Swiss-Prot record:
<dbReference type="InterPro" id="IPR014722">
    <property type="entry name" value="Rib_uL2_dom2"/>
</dbReference>
<dbReference type="InterPro" id="IPR014726">
    <property type="entry name" value="Ribosomal_uL2_dom3"/>
</dbReference>
<dbReference type="InterPro" id="IPR022666">
    <property type="entry name" value="Ribosomal_uL2_RNA-bd_dom"/>
</dbReference>
<dbReference type="GO" id="GO:0005762">
    <property type="term" value="C:mitochondrial large ribosomal subunit"/>
</dbReference>
<dbReference type="GO" id="GO:0003723">
    <property type="term" value="F:RNA binding"/>
</dbReference>
<dbReference type="InterPro" id="IPR008991">
    <property type="entry name" value="Translation_prot_SH3-like_sf"/>
</dbReference>
<dbReference type="Pfam" id="PF00181">
    <property type="entry name" value="Ribosomal_L2"/>
</dbReference>
<feature type="region of interest" description="Disordered">
    <location>
        <begin position="224"/>
        <end position="274"/>
    </location>
</feature>
<dbReference type="GO" id="GO:0016740">
    <property type="term" value="F:transferase activity"/>
</dbReference>
<dbReference type="GO" id="GO:0003735">
    <property type="term" value="F:structural constituent of ribosome"/>
</dbReference>
<dbReference type="InterPro" id="IPR002171">
    <property type="entry name" value="Ribosomal_uL2"/>
</dbReference>
<dbReference type="InterPro" id="IPR022669">
    <property type="entry name" value="Ribosomal_uL2_C"/>
</dbReference>
<protein>
    <recommendedName>
        <fullName>Large ribosomal subunit protein uL2cz/uL2cy</fullName>
    </recommendedName>
</protein>
<comment type="similarity">
    <text>Belongs to the universal ribosomal protein uL2 family.</text>
</comment>
<dbReference type="InterPro" id="IPR022671">
    <property type="entry name" value="Ribosomal_uL2_CS"/>
</dbReference>
<dbReference type="GO" id="GO:0032543">
    <property type="term" value="P:mitochondrial translation"/>
</dbReference>
<keyword id="KW-0150">Chloroplast</keyword>
C-alpha cells in the first residue's frame, strides 16, 4: 500500500496520510444491502457498544472465505476497496464462469492465477489443507472448523505461521502471538493479507472518522464522578485509584477477560501476547 501525503494547504491535509485507494467496481450479483441497525444500541435502544453511529451507507461484498471452487484455476481481474474491512478484495474469474471475491493476498497483481484443493502448488493465493503445507509456511484465512470457511488471520496485513504437525493436529502461531492447535484437515490460504501498511494511515481530521461510523471518544478523567470512576477533582486531577477502571467500575487495561473453562483452552498452547 502506498501512503499518500497531501500538500499542507489546510490543517486537515497537513495531518492526513491516506492510502492510494483502489477504485471500487463491484458486481451487482456479489453485493447486497445490509441493515446496520441500532448504531451500537440493543433492541431497547440502550447503548451497548460505545462510540458508534453515523457513517456513510455501505453495501456488503460477499467474500468467498470457504474457497470451495476446487481444482479450477481462477484469474485476478480487479483489486478493489471494501468499506467493510481494512483489507482489499479482488475479483476472481474462474475457468467454469464462476465469479467470486476473495481477500487480496499481499503482492498479488491483476492477471495472477490461483487455485484451491489438495496437493496444489504452494503459491501465494492458493488454498489447500494444512496437511499439504510444509512447515514455516506463511498463511491467512484459516479455518477453525472443517468446511466452515476461514475465520482466523483475515485482517489487513495479518499472517500466521505453520510451526508443527503432529498426529491429527497442526500447530499455528497466530498474529496475536497465540500458539494453538487446529485440525490438519482445515484449509488456509498461502501468503499474507494485503494492505499491510494500513496502520500508517492517518485520517487527519474528525470528519473522516465520522464517515467510518466512529463517534468521538471522551476520556473518563474529564467527566464528572457521576459519569465515570475517574471523574471529578479540582483542575487536572489523577484518577484517584490504584488501577484504572471502566465506566461501570470494572478493572480495565490489563485485566484478563477471557471466559474460564472454555472448551478451546486445551487447544491453546500459549496465550496471546498482544
Amino acid at each position: 500500500m502506498a501512503i499518500h501525503l497531501y500538500k499542507t494547504s489546510t490543517p486537515s491535509t497537513r495531518n492526513g496520510a491516506v492510502d492510494s485507494q483502489v477504485k471500487s467496481n463491484t458486481r451487482n450479483n456479489l453485493i447486497y444491502g445490509q441493515h446496520r441497525c441500532g448504531k451500537g444500541r440493543n433492541s431497547r435502544g440502550i447503548i451497548t457498544a460505545r462510540h458508534r453511529g453515523g457513517g456513510h451507507k455501505r453495501l456488503y461484498r460477499k467474500i468467498d472465505f470457504r474457497r470451495n471452487e476446487k481444482y479450477i484455476y481462477g484469474r485476478i481481474v480487479t483489486i478493489e476497496y471494501d468499506p467493510n474491512r481494512n483489507a482489499y478484495i479482488c475479483l476472481i474469474h474462474y475457468g467454469d464462469g464462476e465469479k467470486r471475491y476473495i481477500l487480496h493476498p499481499r503482492g498479488a497483481i491483476i492477471g495472477d492465477t490461483i487455485i484451491s484443493g489438495t496437493e496444489v502448488p504452494i503459491k501465494m493465493g492458493n488454498a489447500l489443507p494444512l496437511t499439504d503445507m510444509p512447515l514455516g509456511t506463511a498463511i491467512h484465512n484459516i479455518e477453525i472448523t472443517l468446511g466452515r470457511g476461514g475465520q482466523l488471520a483475515r485482517a489487513a496485513g495479518a499472517v500466521a505461521k505453520l510451526i508443527a504437525k503432529e498426529g491429527k493436529s497442526a500447530t499455528l502461531k497466530l498474529p496475536s502471538g497465540e500458539v494453538r492447535l487446529i485440525s490438519k484437515n482445515c484449509s488456509a490460504t498461502v501468503g499474507q493479507v494485503g494492505n499491510a501498511g494500513v496502520n500508517q494511515k492517518s485520517l487527519g481530521r474528525a470528519g473522516s472518522k465520522c464517515w467510518l461510523g466512529k463517534r468521538p471518544v471522551v476520556r473518563g478523567v474529564v467527566m464528572n464522578p457521576v459519569d465515570h470512576p475517574h471523574g471529578g477533582g479540582e483542575g487536572r486531577a489523577p484518577i484517584g485509584r490504584k488501577k484504572p477502571a471502566t465506566p461501570w467500575g470494572y478493572p480495565a487495561l490489563g485485566r484478563r477477560s477471557r471466559k474460564r473453562n472454555k472448551y478451546s483452552d486445551n487447544l491453546i498452547l500459549r496465550r496471546r501476547s498482544k
